[in-house]
């Protein structure tokens, strides 16, 4: 059975944000929202008209580290566990998706996700015509959305848009259960890791880190702090009840939908 996954080579990533932009175009992601993000660490400087840059790094060399992140399509996905209406689910091929007709906008999935990979449409989504070129239907107000591994492309035998449009070839996509697939060979050959693996989520996205710039390992606490920068996600976490390993694992069922006798 097919089990899709992704390898991101941080030694190749140049922080160009092409993955973020092509994702928005392909999936008609609303203005102000991003499914793909590239976090940046280091290299603080001021770009002045005189070109005066403060020194940084060893020998005065400015260094940058880039951490691409999106939905990790976890095998043990906490977002799937906490959804009270089963709107978030895992497909047979391992891709985690959302049924927008079922989504009630409770945002428990946002509270549960340790990667802050989901966004909520608080208002009626706005799109610029030049930004949306994909065939994916726009999501309505009041639902959560996120990366889908471009499942509409995958079903047609194509790679996700972020993979195809990465100018540095830093992304490798394929079947994790096929030992002969390129993505499986990368995982077997290189020293890969999963983000926040201590959470027990078992992501389907793997990262290659090196000791050389630009790719260098990020400490878990630093990464978790960077990921947790969305006010809606933090507010949802505060409303969560039972928390285990950093995310809510208790299914929340609205009283009006709960089963049982009156």
Swiss-Prot record:
Cofactor remark from the record: Binds 4 [4Fe-4S] clusters.
PANTHER family, per the entry: PROTEIN NRFC, PROTEIN NRFC HOMOLOG
Gene3D superfamilies for the chain: 3.30.70.20
Name of the protein in its database record: Putative dimethyl sulfoxide reductase iron-sulfur subunit B
Organism: Halobacterium salinarum (strain ATCC 700922 / JCM 11081 / NRC-1)
Locations listed in the record: Cell membrane
Pfam families according to UniProt: Fer4_11
Superkingdom assignment: Archaea
Cofactor: [4Fe-4S] cluster
InterPro entries per the UniProt record, alphabetical: 4Fe4S_Fe-S-bd, 4Fe4S_Fe_S_CS, DsrO-like, ET_IronSulfur_Cluster-Binding
Purpose of the protein: Dimethyl sulfoxide (DMSO) reductase catalyzes the reduction of dimethyl sulfoxide (DMSO) to dimethyl sulfide (DMS) during anaerobic respiration; it can also use trimethylamine N-oxide (TMAO) as terminal electron acceptor. Subunit B is proposed to be involved in electron transfer.
Membrane topology: Peripheral membrane protein
Subunit-level organization: Probable multiprotein complex that likely consists of DmsA, DmsB and DmsC.
GO molecular function (one): 4 iron, 4 sulfur cluster binding
CDD domains: PsrB
Keyword S-adenosyl-L-methionine appears in the UniProt entry: no
Region Disordered, annotated ranges: 209-262
Binding-site positions, [4Fe-4S] cluster 2: 23, 147, 150, 162
Binding-site positions, [4Fe-4S] cluster 4: 83, 103, 106, 109
Cellular component terms (Gene Ontology): plasma membrane
NCBIfam families found in the cross-reference section: DsrO
Induction: By anaerobic conditions. Its expression is under the control of DmsR.
Keywords: 4Fe-4S, Cell membrane, Electron transport, Iron, Iron-sulfur, Membrane, Metal-binding, Repeat, Transport
Principal cellular location given in the protein's record: membrane
Residues where [4Fe-4S] cluster 3 binds: 71, 74, 79, 113
Matches recorded under PROSITE patterns: 4FE4S_FER_1, 4FE4S_FER_2
């Amino acid at each position: 059975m097919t089990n899709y996954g992704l390898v991101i080579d941080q030694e190749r990533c140049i922080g160009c944000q092409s993955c973020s932009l092509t994702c928005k175009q392909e999936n008609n992601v609303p203005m102000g929202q991003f499914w793909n993000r590239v976090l940046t660490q280091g290299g603080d400087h001021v770009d002045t008209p005189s070109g005066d840059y403060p020194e940084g790094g060893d020998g005065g060399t400015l260094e940058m580290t880039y951490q691409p992140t999106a939905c990790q399509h976890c095998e043990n996905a906490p977002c799937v566990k906490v959804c009270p209406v089963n709107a978030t689910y895992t497909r047979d091929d391992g891709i985690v998706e959302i049924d927008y007709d079922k989504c009630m906008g409770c945002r428990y999935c946002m509270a549960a996700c340790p990667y802050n990979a989901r966004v909520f449409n608080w208002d009626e989504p706005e799109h610029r015509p030049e930004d949306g070129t994909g065939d994916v239907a726009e999501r309505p107000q009041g639902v959560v959305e996120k990366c889908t591994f471009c499942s509409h492309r995958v079903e047609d035998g194509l790679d996700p848009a972020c993979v195809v449009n990465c100018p540095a070839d830093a992304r490798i996509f394929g079947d994790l259960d096929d030992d002969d697939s390129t993505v499986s060979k990368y995982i077997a050959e290189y020293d890969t890791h999963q983000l926040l693996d201590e959470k027990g989520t078992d992501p389907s996205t793997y990262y290659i880190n090196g000791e050389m710039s630009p790719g260098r390992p990020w400490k878990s606490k630093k990464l978790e702090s960077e990921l947790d920068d969305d006010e809606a996600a933090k507010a949802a976490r505060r409303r969560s009840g039972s928390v285990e390993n950093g995310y809510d694992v208790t299914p929340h069922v609205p009283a009006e939908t709960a089963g049982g006798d009156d």
